[in-house]
Amino acid sequence: MSAIEVKNLVKKFHGQTVLHGINLEVAEGEVVAIIGPSGSGKTTLLRSINLLEQPESGTIRVGEITIDTAKPIGQQKGLIRRLRQHVGFVFQSFNLFPHRTVLENIIEGPVIVKGEDKPGAIARARELLAKVGLVGKEGSYPRRLSGGQQQRVAIARALAMRPDVILFDEPTSALDPELVGEVLNAIRALAQEKRTMVIVTHEMSFARDVADRAIFMDQGRIVEEGEAKALFANPQQARTRQFLEKFLMQ
């Protein structure tokens, strides 16, 4: 069974359709990169999987939990809460609590939401900080960290919930260029662990080299998808070729 399955997903903003019946499957352990121009629906699709956006219709399944978005969301709050416990989400703007330390940011979810014991959550948080290269930053506040360090804390925070799936929404777009590499390296290490991940990104080389599969979206539709290296090397659709033209010429 696939880790994620999206069927016939439709989303509208102010009467305008921004996702036109999207179908998507992600296998367990697969890394999928979603690319495309700004406004193509990439982030909306990602946020819909976690029900941060409420679609008009379609179904979303993560593991064994299925949400029918055509039904009132108020009647499915318990299901949505359970689904979110299986899905980690890394935002482009970090979304760390500014008045809590790095350690407090990471243990909040496991202790408050999942009911884990605090000493165990702290021990795991320290392990995760080591994984993302932030040993010794436990007591730091977000304002004392660079953007790249804050994003790596956000990744550790997502991992602390032991998610089955991790969604990344343009995780490097808010970073200074010299800080991008450290975040991409952290995500690359997770890919090597065969974690199930969906990554919306403008980092084309990263998408080509790290993803198993790439999806190109435009105007709320999936235009083309395929094995990542093949899609970048030889896109089949004219719109995909047009989008990738500058990248392919490098």
PLM regions and their residue ranges:
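C-terminal boundary and immediately downstream tail of ABC-type ATPase nucleotide-binding domains
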Residues: Q219, E225, K229-Q250
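ABC family nucleotide-binding domain
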Residues: S2-A228
